[in-house]
Amino acid sequence: IAIVDCSDYPKPVCSLEYMPLCGSDSKTYSNKCDFCNAFVDSNGTLSLSHFGKC
């Protein structure tokens, strides 16, 4: 199981760094910041499926 620590999120601005993560919603997030902001918005229901594109 892949785990990402989102304790420092949400952040108002994300970098443009591209390190894709695949969420449990089958959506590819461009980086940890994008994923963690979505995780916070989902009230913890979103999880990381795997590293890399979906």
From Swiss-Prot:
An annotated GO cellular component: extracellular region
Keyword terms of this UniProt record: Disulfide bond, Glycoprotein, Protease inhibitor, Repeat, Secreted, Serine protease inhibitor
Q: Where is this site: Reactive bond 3?
A: 16-17
Q: Which domain of life is it from?
A: Eukaryota
Q: Which residues form the Kazal-like domain?
A: 4-54
Please give the record's comment on domains.
Answer: Avian ovomucoid consists of three homologous, tandem Kazal family inhibitory domains.
- The protein in question is named Ovomucoid
